[in-house]
Amino acid sequence: MKLKRFLKQETVLSVAAVLAVLSMFFVPPDADYLCYIDLRTLAILFSLMTIMAGLRRQGVFDRMGRALLARTGSTLQLVLVLVGLCFFGSMIITNDVSLLTFVPFTFVVLSGLAPDTRRALTIPVVCMQTIAANLGSMLTPIGNPQNLYLYGKSGMSMAEFLLLMFPYTVVSLLLLVGWAVAVCRKQASSCIGALPEQPNTTADRKIILLDAVLFEVCLLAVVRVLPYGVAFAAVLVCTLCADRSTLRNVDYSLLLTFVAFFIFIGNLGRIPAFSGWLQAILAGREVLVAVLASQVTSNVPAALLLSGFTDETAALIIGTNLGGLGTLIASMASLISYRQIARELPEEKGRYFKLFTLSNLIFLVILLAEWRIIGR
């Protein structure tokens, strides 16, 4: 039973581990395996996840959300704030953390509305938040795991990365605002009810300040001003000394998934027949192949897999970010919202899945059309 539960909870890690082990039969372990592992990506990813876990434990993001919601005076403003928290928040705190924080928060906030309004808004708003987190996160190298990895691999400057994804981010924001306006058009113009009470927790300002400083150190490592080892050591030592329990909230399964895929991809690259076949498929079709691969494997594994067989990293960045749209597993972050719906509104799972799939496909078609038009 424990194994079955683990496989269900850690499906991607389990598949990655099996693939890594199978590839070892074709390429027996040797010293070259050490070259497979991208320590820079793992170190920075661990550091960022630790910092975000610490800030989340201190209720920083919850308090930010409440401060913004206190200024809302209409249903449209309420929806725009809830969606905007995920869209803009994901650029800094990653798509996973923004959904883990703000989707449960949304259920609490919407519970203060009239029943009919609450039922009309909940499913569309959570769908919008999920798309917002996935598309907002594509703007920055730290917005999601595949961006962090591909940014490090590309050698781009921060400005080059931002300019690459900026056009898609702007169109995404406009689409989300238009959707919010359409959803709220039939609702009452003013919000009903009050904000939920602040949980009785006391934030440790020293830890918040420490995490803020460590976050700046990590950013310097991301843009290659500081060695990644310095950032990793600073985060690990400071967290062990000041906020050790936060380390229990780090997503170690994601780190292990990266390691497994690094081994699998490294071994595939040493199998000439497969390497040549995949390179031929990718040539000139990097964006579309990345989008399609993401629908089946999700965009993080797609980025890890395809990056070993093409030098067109910019195209993979576009493809894996747009590829986060589509199926429910195209971005693993989308499962966070689905699980929340299944827990809070189990009878609405079907309606959510239909709206999620339809809206994702519409966004994907529009953004792919934009990619075709601007040619990058």
Region roles according to the model:
Residues 2, 174-235:
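Long, contiguous bundles of hydrophobic transmembrane helices that form the permeation core
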Residues 88-138, 149, 304-318, 346-351, ...:
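Hydrophobic transmembrane alpha-helices that form the pore/transport pathway of multi-pass ion
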Residues 36, 58, 62-65, 213-311:
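Transmembrane helical segments that form the transport core of multi-pass membrane transport proteins
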Residues 2-9, 30-41, 156-168, 200-205, ...:
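Interfacial loop-to-helix junctions that mark the boundaries of transmembrane helices
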Residues 2-32, 42-59, 183-185, 217-245, ...:
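Structural signal for alpha-helical transmembrane segments and their membrane-water exit/capping regions
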Residues 159-203, 335-376:
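Juxtamembrane and boundary regions of transmembrane helices in multi-pass small-molecule transporters
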Residues 76-81, 114-128, 156-166, 312-324, ...:
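Membrane-interface alpha-helices at helix entry/exit sites of multi-pass transporters
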Residues 39-41, 70-83, 113-125, 205-209, ...:
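Membrane-interfacial loop-to-helix junctions in multi-pass transporters
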